Amino acid sequence: MYGGVIYPRILDELIPNWFEHAPIQRWVVRRSTMLLSDTGALNIDYRSNAWGQAPYNGATAYRPDFDNWLAQQAVAAGAELICSTTVTGLLRDAQGRINGITTDRPDGDLTASVVIACDGVNSFIAKDAGLYASVDASNYTLGVKETLSLPKSVIDERFGVRDNQGVDIEILGGTSGVNGGGFIYTNLDTIALGVVLKLPKLSAQKKRPEEIIAELKRHP
């Protein structure tokens, strides 16, 4: 999953017929790659109405809704969900092997045979484990997204879709001289518009990401 687009191959393996229950906004039936210059665009577009039928090719979703649903699927399969808890460090056995985590809860230590660090690109757990020897900003990008409200009928008309059909557009260029690109996803009554920017050039340009999004929206 990337941002608000779900690619279902792994879900197909883990949760049969997940698409019958998941909180989906739209099923992606059109995917485009758009190359932008300062004043023009070249669009490579592919559309298949078959993608709007099971087992589907991709979907858009609101992450809070989808992530909550996915967590409940894990609970139903036997996982224990612990919310409102901050992981503060790692536990190690006498040989120095990682065998659990510490938390901000009283008596909140948890032991495990496997610990998976899911605390983001700046993972403090991975650093504590010694997996981040150094951090090079040139290996990182920054993603920023706006969500724009529009009536469903307007989205359907502008993107040439109907019912719960959706569109996924990936953009190369159009980021004000900063290495990177952008994206547009359609939800039922909103559009997600965002950019992904290389950190060194973004810092050198001394521009804020929201300024680059504003310039992208003004592209002719």
Regions found by a protein language model. Give the residues of each.
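N-terminal FAD cofactor-binding segment of flavoenzymes
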Residues: M1-T39
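Short, glycine/acidic-enriched capping/hinge loops at junctions between secondary-structure elements
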Residues: M1-Y2, I44-Y46, K127-D128, Q205-K206
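Generic secondary-structure boundary/loop-capping signal
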Residues: Y2-G3, P8, R30-R31, A41, ...
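Residues that recognize and position ribonucleotide moieties
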Residues: G4, R26, A59, E80, ...
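Short, mixed charged/polar active-site loops
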Residues: T39-N43, D107-D109
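Helix-loop-beta segment of a Rossmann-like dinucleotide-binding subdomain
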Residues: A41-R63, V196-L199
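Predominantly flavin-linked oxidoreductase catalytic cores and closely associated redox partners
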Residues: P64, W69, Q73-P220
